[in-house]
Amino acid sequence: MALNVVILAAGKGTRMRSDLPKVLHPIAHKSMVQHVIDTAHQVGSDAIQLVYGYGADKLQAKLGEQQLNWVLQAEQLGTGHAVAQANDNISDDDTVLILYGDVPLIQASTLEALLAAREDNGLAILTVNLPNPTGYGRIVREDGNVVGIVEQKDANAEQLAISEINTGIMATPGKQLKAWLGQLSSDNAQGEYYLTDIVAMAHKDGVAITTAQPESAVEVEGANNRVQLAQLERAYQARAAEKLMLEGANLRDPARIDIRGDVTVGMDVMIDINVVIEGKVTIGNNVTIGAGAILIDCEISDNAVIKPYSIIESAKVGVDASAGPFARLRPGAELKQDAHIGNFVEMKKAVLGKGSKAGHLAYIGDATIGAGVNIGAGTITCNYDGANKFQTIIEDNVFVGSDTQLVAPVTIGEGATLGAGSTITKDVAAGELVITRVKQRHLTGWARPVKQKK
């Protein structure tokens, strides 16, 4: 049987007070619906039907490059009506897994448990027990067996006392699902076609109904307003922080880290407060990340130190290397083993060789720097002429004095020394000392201009 996933994502989300479709609001810099799509892939979906309605252009602009079957729900007439729009894309022998685009924290392990709980040609529904089930459909059982689901507005007093609620997530055989959807009625308090009504139909047809529950109730919580969205964000971050700690990271304060992607950490990693980790980030063993650092799509090797308020984006930091505080590695930058950049140093598409240092106030762009090089404060590689970029090459053991400009393309030979304040426009041979400063003049008897009083 193929696993056919239907994701309901047609709602506007009026309570969000936004022009953005509800399911595009982000958790950890990724839209809620993208979280659900990714989880569907994790459980081995063979096809994904995305039922959309409001904000179609924005949804397709955000998600359009993915392998999705787009299913329009022109009118929002309930969850049963929404699923029915995908009927043409469902085969009789499919297992249909129904998910929700605004329930982003559902875990693959929970869905795998739900699918495993489903008997042959049976219906499996995901339920959860809540201390306060107000607003949710209740699971009605007889002798322990599920016989139906009743919505809050249609429930009697006895049913309202039930704490086991329907999450809406279910796995069902394709053939029966299509038959049940054709029997739905809107004769209820909401005037909508409830997907939950198929549970009673399954019971009537003698179909085996089984249930599974998530590890945590937060997995099945949705976001209808920005307060709930923020609550889901905190829950996501808490889960991500816990995962890091279990993998070997020490978090100074687990409530003050922001994880917005996939991060892999080694042992004995120390992460201070207010660190942001985004995209795909790999952190080696014994790494220290200072407060306020931002790591984006980067690799940090063993024993490296990222000092406070540094930004490392699409860059590599080598073994025993360090950056910061207030340093910036832009895309294509790399610090080799034991290299160091200090405060207010920026690198872009540049390599700083083994043991080389740029301690402060420098820009290094489109450059290859060898081992044992000292880059003085205020050094700039002048790599752009307004139209084209050019390379600067600095070989091993070069000393670059403070306030030096290297006008690319230019090569500085091994062991050369560049005097402070020099502007280098031509290649420098190995071992040379180059000074291009204007000769210092001393003017005696000179008086500073005095401002005239008005």
Curated annotation (Swiss-Prot):
Its main location: cytoplasm. Keywords: Acyltransferase, Cell shape, Cell wall biogenesis/degradation, Cytoplasm, Magnesium, Metal-binding, Multifunctional enzyme, Nucleotidyltransferase, Peptidoglycan synthesis, Repeat, Transferase. UDP-N-acetyl-alpha-D-glucosamine binds at residues 8-11, 22, 73, 78-79, 100-102, 137, 151, 166, 224, 330, 348, 363, 374. Mg(2+) binds at D102, N224. Its cofactor is Mg(2+). It catalyses: alpha-D-glucosamine 1-phosphate + acetyl-CoA = N-acetyl-alpha-D-glucosamine 1-phosphate + CoA + H(+); N-acetyl-alpha-D-glucosamine 1-phosphate + UTP + H(+) = UDP-N-acetyl-alpha-D-glucosamine + diphosphate. One of its GO terms (biological process) is regulation of cell shape. Its EC number is 2.7.7.23, 2.3.1.157. Residues 1-226 are annotated as: Pyrophosphorylase. It is found in: Cytoplasm. Acetyl-CoA binds at A377, N383, Y384, S402, A420, R437. Gene3D superfamilies: Hexapeptide repeat proteins (2.160.10.10), Spore Coat Polysaccharide Biosynthesis Protein SpsA, Chain A (3.90.550.10). It holds the Pfam family NTP_transf_3. Pathway: Nucleotide-sugar biosynthesis; UDP-N-acetyl-alpha-D-glucosamine biosynthesis; N-acetyl-alpha-D-glucosamine 1-phosphate from alpha-D-glucosamine 6-phosphate (route II): step 2/2; Nucleotide-sugar biosynthesis; UDP-N-acetyl-alpha-D-glucosamine biosynthesis; UDP-N-acetyl-alpha-D-glucosamine from N-acetyl-alpha-D-glucosamine 1-phosphate: step 1/1; Bacterial outer membrane biogenesis; LPS lipid A biosynthesis. The active site is at H360 (proton acceptor). One of its GO terms (cellular component) is cytoplasm. Homotrimer. Catalyzes the last two sequential reactions in the de novo biosynthetic pathway for UDP-N-acetylglucosamine (UDP-GlcNAc). The C-terminal domain catalyzes the transfer of acetyl group from acetyl coenzyme A to glucosamine-1-phosphate (GlcN-1-P) to produce N-acetylglucosamine-1-phosphate (GlcNAc-1-P), which is converted into UDP-GlcNAc by the transfer of uridine 5-monophosphate (from uridine 5-triphosphate), a reaction catalyzed by the N-terminal domain. In the N-terminal section; belongs to the N-acetylglucosamine-1-phosphate uridyltransferase family. This is Bifunctional protein GlmU. It comes from Shewanella halifaxensis (strain HAW-EB4). The lineage of its organism: Bacteria, Pseudomonadati, Pseudomonadota, Gammaproteobacteria, Alteromonadales.
